[in-house]
Amino acid sequence: MSQFSFTKMHGLGNSYIYVNMFEEQIPEEDLALVAEKVSNINTGIGADGMILICPSDVAPVKMRMFNNDGSEGKSCGNGLRCVAKYAYEHKLVEETVFTIETLAGIVTAEVTVEDGVVTLAKIDMGAPRLTRAEIPMLGEGETPFIRENFLYNNHRYAFTAVSMGNPHAVIFVDDVEKAPLTTLGPVLETHEMFPERVNVEFIEILNDDEMNFRVWERGSGVTQACGTGACAAVVAAILNGKMERGKEITVHLAGGDLMIAWTEEGNVLMKGPAEVICRGVYEYKIEA
């Protein structure tokens, strides 16, 4: 029987099991199965996935994120805020501004601290990727993929594709509560046009600086929040002329609010909370 210490954290209800790989060891070949096991709500701890906080050669810490189906993702906005909180509070970093390595690249985190506790984290998510090759999508073309039609159940849905280090398909609707989240979501997620699958967001514009947001995440299904998805939604809204670049936009997710801005300089900034749920030791056995 193997075991490791963990911290379960969430960003707006998007929860992961966090493992400090500065102290713990999980064999590389076991990571996918361990992520699937520990995330199981019935036989594990229950979460949207597992995130490893690892040493890095190019930053103070590195984040590796696994979905609850065992697949590894390249980035996770809510996860990055929680990693930033963990790293500062566990003295893996000393400054309130520091970098985090991800499979999608290096991002900059800034934490707000009160009495030694991180109450808010802001992440510079970098510039959005908008070409088919960068998202990635099948086909050629260097222009952004904006409001392209997708036929489902005899209804045409127009979506805009954005990558924030992971791929997103953003669909604007009149009411997110009536959006086909659990039906169209998995169909679009696994469509052949997205070779790495895709996260699917449904967006309802409320006014010039507010939107409602619901998400079907690749590898996880419906979740309470998706930080990179909120960033992609704001970028898509601006590309479609629905919102103004440079303004801070409030994104109302099922789990709470994020503040997102696509700056004139090109990067996307995400600000929001990160909270600890519980800590403990997880025991597991890998069958031979």
Curated annotation (Swiss-Prot):
It is found in: Cytoplasm. Transmembrane segments: none annotated. Pathway: Amino-acid biosynthesis; L-lysine biosynthesis via DAP pathway; DL-2,6-diaminopimelate from LL-2,6-diaminopimelate: step 1/1. Keywords: Amino-acid biosynthesis, Cytoplasm, Isomerase, Lysine biosynthesis. One of its GO terms (molecular function) is diaminopimelate epimerase activity. SUPFAM superfamilies: Diaminopimelate epimerase-like (SSF54506). It catalyses: (2S,6S)-2,6-diaminopimelate = meso-2,6-diaminopimelate. GO terms for cellular component: cytosol. Its EC number is 5.1.1.7. It comes from the Bacteria. Substrate binds at residues 14, 67, 77-78, 166, 199, 217-218, 227-228. The record marks 168, 217 as: Could be important to modulate the pK values of the two catalytic cysteine residues. It is an enzyme of class 5 (isomerase). The active site is at residues 76, 226. Homodimer. Belongs to the diaminopimelate epimerase family. Catalyzes the stereoinversion of LL-2,6-diaminopimelate (L,L-DAP) to meso-diaminopimelate (meso-DAP), a precursor of L-lysine and an essential component of the bacterial peptidoglycan. HAMAP family: DAP_epimerase (MF_00197). This is Diaminopimelate epimerase.
